[in-house]
Amino acid sequence: MGQKVHPNGMRLGIIKKWNSVWFANTKDFADHLDSDYKVRQFLMKTLEKASISRIIIERPAKSIRVTIYTARPGIVIGKKGEDVEKLRISIAKITGVPVQINISEVRKPELDAKLVSDSITSQLERRVMFRRAMKRSVQNAMRQGAKGIKVEVSGRLGGAEIARREWYREGRVPLHTLRANIDYSISEAHTTYGVIGVKVWIFKGEILGGMETVERLDKPSVQTKKQYRKNRK
């Protein structure tokens, strides 16, 4: 029986970048890794309603730089940047080093697998029919320019006694093509019947030229709190 490899892990260093960008000695590596995990867990819990896509952590010269990709930058930044400052102080306590926080806006949340899977799980928890939630997400992604999308849900669908899985796909999703830019995410919906797993694959097109092309295209619209306030005015 064939198994599917993780689409993001398979493409790391080819067309995908790491979420933690730092190098450490053997004695410091475990501490840095544990620190990164705690920072991510803290941010995902604190910013649960801010539609967080991913968190990039860099460690330049005894400090830490955290870039938060979100569909709702206003919620993260808060009034006059108050919330960002609270986050900075909390992360500094966790890591024990000076912290810089950057906010990057996700322009098209319909094409972000993490945000799509979170959207479907929230609908399932609100008792929306799973087929309707899947179809709506697929149609929104295709409307925004996705080359293909596949959504799979598994568990006690509709409260059935026997767990099963169903999937819905539009367009093409070439999992074996390494140059294919496929965004993948998994989420869990906690319903009264039990846990329902949601997997999302989104094919955005092919990237030719490897990591050089990715570096050139993936320069984020990172905003400090001052820039955000200036742009908002």
Curated annotation (Swiss-Prot):
GO terms for molecular function: mRNA binding; rRNA binding; structural constituent of ribosome. InterPro entries: KH_dom (IPR004087), KH_dom-like_a/b (IPR015946), KH_dom_type_2 (IPR004044), KH_sf_prok-type (IPR009019), Ribosomal_S3_C_sf (IPR036419), Ribosomal_uS3_bac-typ (IPR005704), Ribosomal_uS3_C (IPR001351), Ribosomal_uS3_CS (IPR018280). One of its GO terms (biological process) is translation. CDD domains: KH-II_30S_S3. One of its GO terms (cellular component) is cytosolic small ribosomal subunit. SUPFAM superfamilies: Prokaryotic type KH domain (KH-domain type II), Ribosomal protein S3 C-terminal domain. Residues 39-107 form the KH type-2 domain. Keywords: Ribonucleoprotein, Ribosomal protein, RNA-binding, rRNA-binding. HAMAP family: Ribosomal_uS3_B. Part of the 30S ribosomal subunit. Forms a tight complex with proteins S10 and S14. Belongs to the universal ribosomal protein uS3 family. Binds the lower part of the 30S subunit head. Binds mRNA in the 70S ribosome, positioning it for translation. This is Small ribosomal subunit protein uS3. It comes from Buchnera aphidicola subsp. Acyrthosiphon pisum (strain APS). The lineage of its organism: Bacteria, Pseudomonadati, Pseudomonadota, Gammaproteobacteria, Enterobacterales.
